[in-house]
């Protein structure tokens, strides 16, 4: 949901999603891990005519955040747990004791920011990973880049490391830009690029938009 009190704002799309079909036999699994809504959308798209989708919907799902959990619930998945912190490192610590003696399937992107997989392995969790989507950089011509470049004094919201990488691939981060990160890993990535960012109270787009509004009010 977008805040209706914030105007004008634009969505700058620099990546495109590529979905990959799930090829695994689902019989062994009795727990699913979702850290992104995109993994859910990939399953809905690639398995819409397959009995595998119904099987997945009946396996308890462990969701990183409220938005991911809501997407799962809206599409009839069985949500067993929702992360309280909604950040990768904290989430894996929350679910470790819940996943003991379970056979886990982690549905993920091709590139991930957290070390969730390594931590599960380190703690002896019986799990497999399936790459079900990828964030691909869109090709932009020079004229498209010029047309899309944010104006000076813009507030920029970065909802993933992949979005920050894409932005910096095409644009310079001006000194008078203000950056907002949706989560800790995105903020850390920006910091490594020499960009300080504000972090929203919750890792959601709505919280980021509310923060953007409060920053604008302070400037006035």
Place the predicted regions along the sequence by residue.
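Signature of uroporphyrinogen-III synthase
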Residues: 1-220
């Amino acid at each position: 949901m977008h805040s209706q009190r914030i105007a004008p704002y634009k969505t700058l799309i620099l990546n495109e999603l590529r979905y990959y079909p799930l090829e695994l036999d689902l019989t062994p699994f009795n727990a699913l891990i979702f850290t992104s809504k995109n993994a859910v959308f990939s399953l809905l798209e690639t398995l819409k005519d397959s009995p595998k989708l119904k099987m997945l919907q009946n396996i308890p799902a462990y969701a990183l955040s409220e938005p991911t959990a809501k997407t799962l619930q809206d599409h009839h998945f069985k949500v067993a747990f929702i992360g309280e912190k909604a950040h990768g490192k904290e989430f894996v610590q929350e679910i470790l004791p819940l996943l003991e003696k379970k056979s886990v399937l982690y549905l993920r992107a091709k590139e991930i920011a957290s070390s969730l997989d390594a931590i599960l392995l380190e703690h002896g969790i019986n799990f497999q990973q399936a790459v079900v989507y990828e964030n691909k950089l869109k090709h932009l011509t020079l004229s498209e880049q010029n047309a899309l470049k944010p104006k000076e004094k813009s507030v920029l919201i970065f909802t993933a490391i992949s979005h920050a990488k894409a932005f910096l691939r095409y644009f310079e981060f001006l000194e008078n830009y203000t950056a907002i990160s949706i989560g800790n890993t995105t903020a850390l990535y920006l910091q490594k690029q020499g960009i300080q960012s504000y972090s929203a109270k919750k890792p959601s787009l709505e919280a980021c938009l509310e923060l953007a509004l409060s920053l604008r009010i302070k400037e006035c």
